Amino acid sequence: MNQSLLVTKRDGRTERINLDKIHRVLDWAAEGLNNVSVSQVELRSHIQFYDGIKTSDIHETIIKAAADLISRDAPDYQYLAARLAIFHLRKKAFGQFEPPALYHHVVKMVELGKYDNHLLEDYTEEEFKQMDSFIVHDRDMTFSYAAVKQLEGKYLVQNRVTGEIYESAQFLYILVAACLFSNYPRETRLDYVKRFYDAVSTFKISLPTPIMSGVRTPTRQFSSCVLIECGDSLDSINATSSAIVKYVSQRAGIGINAGRIRALGSPIRGGEAFHTGCIPFYKHFQTAVKSCSQGGVRGGAATLFYPMWHLEVESLLVLKNNRGVEGNRVRHMDYGVQINKLMYTRLLKGGDITLFSPSDVPGLYDAFFADQDEFERLYVKYENDDSIRKQRVKAVELFSLMMQERASTGRIYIQNVDHCNTHSPFDPVVAPVRQSNLCLEIALPTKPLHDVNDENGEVALCTLSAFNLGAIKTLDELEELAILAVRALDALLDYQDYPIPAAKRGAMGRRTLGIGVINFAYWLAKNGKRYSDGSANNLTHKTFEAIQYYLLKASNELAKEQGACPWFNETTYAKGILPIDTYKKDLDAIVNEPLHYDWEQLRESIKTHGLRNSTLSALMPSETSSQISNATNGIEPPRGYVSIKASKDGILRQVVPDYEHLKDAYELLWEMPNNDGYLQLVGIMQKFIDQSISANTNYDPSRFPSGKVPMQQLLKDLLTAYKFGVKTLYYQNTRDGAEDAQDDLAPSIQDDGCESGACKI
């Protein structure tokens, strides 16, 4: 290697290249790692050096060289590359490797307008010194390379135009904790700050993108998911559209319920005009969703919901596919089809489904969610009433069209609205659940807006986070983590701003949280269980029982201290009804694990003191934040031992946790013979989870005789999910062979919808 090359320093001076210095940094970064070769990294990077190269470019080149060596056989290169990247990142942020004192850092950032000045108003210099003593900067060294790149790209406070970075990860964690607990009493708050900081910086609790990137800055909107219901009037349609624009501009993912909109040809003003139908209004919503791009990267994302029995359903089911013309397609949203038991019964009995315009059948639309017996009574009555406009379709044909579109686009989702209301934390008579959100894990009550400042409407918000099952040794640890997650997210509801009165009203009244899990696949592998063979059923029951029990207990304790949420009386919890009372009893045939916690004592305590939060749990996808914790995505099986995610910094490779020891214990997605085992586990989780679950179905056409997935199989899985009480189905993934090219490298699914961290964590 040519020792006479000149390099340009960060301050503009030039000097001879110092290869020893580079070697020392590499040695430091490789310490304690297995199966990594410093000389290999040096060889790969030296050939890219040139005369006059900047020291920062040398650093980037070495990092890239190490990252390119990450593989199944040498997973530790992900830590070598990460340490080099942290070194580089701190040099960029602080001008040196050692971070500054926390107090001086905060003062400087507040002056620059990067941090919210409430930090300096709420905490004294002395308290900042105490917080500084809580920080363990060495935890930066536990990140994988993919995590550091995600931090740089999405989470650290920066100038997105110049690329300047202003902080390191441990400052992010301690300041999120400081902001969330800033209104707690002086004598206890630093204790909570320390405990919360420790939980998030050791990856035991995973936070969603809006919280990681936004809390501590002057922008205060951190809800991941927003649910907006539209009425059947022009005022309501316009109010919905305005609400969408307001929330899309603030990084949220949107769920739209447009099921009330009357069908094509319905009379308007007593027949003076006839209605243009749903599609023009769906296009209007699509334009609103795509109006604000996040940092110029891409527009927002939404899932729009409608009932299966809507008169226009056959035109609505095909809106996403790539046939048809611009006029009859609305491709840039995803869709959720709402179904109930009566529809499934008609399918099983070979009957018809009758389609109506909601405007022609008084009471039917509301009963669809609030009262299944009343829905059936009205539905049959309207079927037999010749004066009402309707269309009959064979149930099997309608279901087949829906499943065919789900298979070809992957993005037609399912909501079983009866399960969402019969196994729900809300009393369907006063607070029915009429829609879900972008990623199908939220189930909250909404009311249509009549104008954007309508105080009587209700826009539902959900604030998310997750427990990292890979970072805990026993389920007992969940008790402390539940206390921290519930308290932090509950405090966030008071800390954030609300662009729309109807959103603030609902958030303050219901105080809904959605706490889920990441790293479930690692938890199964670690415990020697598999998705597909039933071996994980009892463990899953035990795990999710613990999660829901500890979350309810934490919210109940918080209610004793700060009062129950104002609309607690609209929940089933207020009547002493718990998830263990209303689950689908078909699950008892596939799991025989007893209950392990004292639910009866908890029931009494909830009846007496209430809950601070109407909902506590939801199982969301976690593509991005699971990379920070080096965890597997949500409850999903991994697609490969090494996943690849394309980012603006090139390819990020991530190896499944503890690969060397557990490679034979992981069950990969396409090794699962069918969806049965997975759907059973989702049903068992849903027994305890009070909202819903982003559950996917997966098909490998090569497993079937004709190389095609038979319709019968698709319908069977849909019915299996319903049988086990599954509330919602999210993506349908079809294996196309492309991802098998490199044996263990699996592309991570690119879901434009949730990239911003909207509705997922």
What is each PLM-predicted segment?
Residues R44-S45, I63-A65, Y79-F87, A199, ...:
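A glycine-rich phosphate-binding loop feature that marks nucleotide/adenosyl-phosphate handling sites
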Residues A199, A482-K504, M508, K529-S622, ...:
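Internal maturation/activation junctions in enzymes
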Residues V157, E164, F171-R189, V193, ...:
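Function-dense linear segments that define catalytic or interfacial modules
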Residues M1-Q3, V36-I174, A178, D191-Y197:
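Core nucleic-acid recognition elements
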Residues Y77-G113, K149, I339-K341, C420-D451, ...:
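Terminal amphipathic helices with adjacent charged low-complexity linkers/tails
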Residues R13-I17, E164-E167, E187-D191, I211-T217, ...:
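Alpha-helix capping and helix-loop boundary segments enriched in small/acidic/polar residues
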Residues T124-L151, L440-T446, L489, L493-D494, ...:
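Catalytic alpha/beta core of large soluble enzyme barrels
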